[in-house]
Swiss-Prot record:
This is Chaperone protein HtpG. InterPro entries: HATPase_C_sf (IPR036890), Heat_shock_protein_90_CS (IPR019805), HSP90_C (IPR037196), Hsp90_fam (IPR001404), Hsp90_N (IPR020575), Ribosomal_Su5_D2-typ_SF (IPR020568). One of its GO terms (cellular component) is cytoplasm. GO terms for molecular function: ATP binding; ATP hydrolysis activity; ATP-dependent protein folding chaperone; unfolded protein binding. Belongs to the heat shock protein 90 family. Coiled coil: none annotated.
């Protein structure tokens, strides 16, 4: 190695300092993963070289046989990992080994709690990559040269994992990257061939690149010549190309950790080879937990794309719809050309066919998980349910299938847990019920005792309780399931159809006619605040409620639009009253018109509060209520 030139000392990005500190302390109990992370990076470097060499074969520099080599020195207490992949230029070294260029990094770091066990899961999810070397090393040296640059443009990066790192230009004859870990005191166990072999077999057997270690000689062979003999210690074949029957669950799980940069096992996976008009292999995984950036729409998503086993790109998001953005995995096609680009992917009809088939495969996989492992599906729903709810709006062709995977809280369920499927609901419907009833609101606590549910409780009719911010928007696209229409119990003029007897309907009409005078007085008192006043069929215990017009926006949608700064169309509620309630009877008998108006406004404001809405004039409400209390106490 020649003399170093252009040497400079630079500081780590603030987030890197935080991550290094947290990682070294949180991941210490699982320290052997440093090797998996470094091998994974080396594998990616080889993939990138293969891809770039499609257009520029000269990048291979006459060495097309790509491999990873692991060596160690017990006396020097070092472990060295070397690859002959794409390598890095000086600028790339500073960018990749000094900063974290991930969206949502700051948010991620805020979520760390200081609880080592919880933080280790989060950090593992984030993908620690190269920085994991500092779990076992107190100094790391990186020697690298990018393919296509001259031998004089090699780079030496060095750091003790504290606040700064050094970068210098050096001579490096071979392209690729060599990482030298100077092991901390107490970590000498890793400078051992048997230990390194075991870690490679455990975590990286599936890597398609040969991983070589020096051959160890025993007995009489121990005094063999000093020339190193290398032997491959992993299978070195792309896991997805092997027959399913030959792949163990543990191998699938380790491969998932490699492609997803996750520490935890996936919930389930699907490995499938398609032959015929289209030819491709897919290996798709459902993660066990949501990534920290699930709701960052610009966050990387999509599958690893290979064409004829040659890596083409990461995060190919054209193969699955956005509502399945949490799915990880690989797709390897024989039908695409090796020079395929993102622009081509967006226009190729072959991609549309593959997207349709892969989407169906994921939905089938989720159906199977829900049927065979309901407890694991509960974990899936908790992590990804709100994202899956985007499906009916995005994917008309699979709307019914997605609807079958949705889960809700319900008046027949246990608390606020979203565990009721639409099939469960339909299995419990009453004779003559041809609708699926639901109610939306801000929280389970707010809507579980809503006056809108009173008649349903009286008649023993189950109502789904929808409290996620996305729910009202979801229901604007999900209008029916299995031939039965969805009905919002807080919207329009409630008609229970055959669930109301002819006698009930006749009695309702008679009461409405009898209360025409009261209806007119209430309209006069409420004026422009309401669209309509009518006798309610919904109430059994409460005096009044506010219903939403059939075409009007509900509270959830109004709040979403307001939060995003959009203009909210003006709408007025429908005031419904319970004619048999003592307060309404008292109101009907009130001769003093001023007091009638005050009482009416109190009832209106109480109905607004019960619906989860805020009062336009809280001070006027308090004033009227205090006035009433004074009169009652006199």
């Amino acid at each position: 190695m020649s003399v170093e030139t252009q040497k400079e000392t630079l500081g780590f990005q603030t987030e890197v300092k935080q991550l290094l500190h947290l990682m070294i302390h949180s991941l210490y109990s699982n320290k052997e993963i440093f090797l998996r992370e470094l091998i994974s990076n080396a594998s990616d470097a080889a993939d990138k070289l293969r891809f770039e060499a499609l257009a520029k074969p000269e990048l291979l520099e006459g060495g097309a046989e790509l491999k990873i080599r692991l060596s160690f020195d017990k006396d020097a207490k070092t472990v060295t990992l070397e690859d002959n992949g794409i390598g890095m230029s000086r600028d790339e070294v500073i960018a990749h080994l000094g900063t974290i260029a991930k969206s949502g990094t700051a948010d991620f770091l805020k979520n760390l709690s200081g609880d080592q066990k919880k933080d280790s899961h989060l950090i593992g999810q984030f993908g620690v990559g190269f920085y994991s070397a500092f779990i076992v090393a107190d100094k790391v040296d990186v020697f690298t040269r990018r393919a296509g640059l001259s031998a004089a443009e090699g780079v030496h990066w060095s750091s003790k994992g504290e606040g700064e790192f050094e970068v210098a230009t050096v001579e490096k004859a071979e392209r690729g990257t060599r990482i030298v870990l100077h092991l901390k005191s107490g970590e000498e166990e890793f400078a051992d061939g048997w230990r390194l072999r075991n870690i490679v077999k455990k975590y990286s057997d599936h890597i398609a690149l040969p991983i070589e270690l020096p051959k160890e000689h025993y007995g009489e062979e121990k005094d063999k010549p000093a020339e190193v003999e290398w032997e491959t210690v992993n299978r070195a074949s792309a896991l997805w190309t092997r027959p399913r029957a030959e792949v163990k669950d543990e191998e699938y799980q380790e491969f998932y950790k490699h492609v997803a940069h996750d520490f935890e096992n996936p919930l389930t996976w699907s490995h499938n080879k398609v032959e015929g008009k289209l030819e491709y292999t897919s290996l798709l995984y459902v993660p066990g937990r949501a990534p920290f950036d699930l709701y960052h729409r610009e966050a990387p998503k999509g599958l690893k794309l290979y064409v004829q086993r040659v890596f083409i790109m990461d995060q190919a998001d054209e193969f699955l719809p956005l509502y399945l953005r949490f799915i990880k995995g690989v797709v390897d096609s024989n039908d695409l050309s090796l020079n395929v680009s993102r622009e081509i992917l967006q226009k190729d009809p072959v991609i549309d066919s593959m997207k349709s088939a892969l989407t169906k495969r994921v939905l089938d996989m989720l159906e199977k998980l829900a049927k065979d492992k309901p407890e694991e599906y509960k974990a899936f729903w908790k992590a990804f349910g709100q994202v899956l709810k985007e499906g009916p709006a995005e994917d008309f062709a699979n709307k019914e299938k997605i609807a079958g995977l949705l889960r809700f809280a319900s008046t027949a369920g246990e608390g606020d847990e979203q565990s009721v499927s639409l099939a469960d609901y339909l299995g419990r419907v009453k004779d003559g019920q041809d609708k699926i009833y639901y109610l939306t609101g801000e929280s389970y606590a707010q809507i579980k005792n809503s006056p809108h549910l009173e008649v349903f409780r009286k008649k023993g009719i189950e109502v789904l309780l929808l409290t996620d911010r996305i729910d009202e928007w979801l229901m604007s696209y999900l209008t029916e399931f299995d031939g039965k229409q969805f009905v919002d119990v807080a919207r329009g003029d409630l008609d229970l159809g055959k669930l109301d007897s002819e006698e009930d309907k006749k009695a309702q009409e008679e009461v409405a006619k009898a209360k025409e005078g009261l209806i007119e007085r209430l309209k006069g008192a409420l004026g422009e605040q309401v669209k309509e006043v009518r006798v309610s069929h919904r109430l059994t215990d409460s005096p009044a409620i506010l219903a939403i017009g059939e075409q009007d926006l509900g509270l959830q949608m109004r709040q979403i639009l307001e939060a995003s700064g959009q203009k909210v169309p003006e709408s007025k509620p429908i005031f419904e009253f319970n004619p048999s309630h003592p307060l309404i009877e008292r109101l009907d008998a009130e001769a003093d018109e001023d007091r009638f108006v005050d009482l009416t406004h109190i009832l209106f404001d109480q109905a607004a509060l019960a619906a989860g809405d805020s009062l336009k004039d809280p001070a006027a409400y308090v004033q009227r209520l205090n006035k009433l209390l004074v009169e009652l106490s006199a």
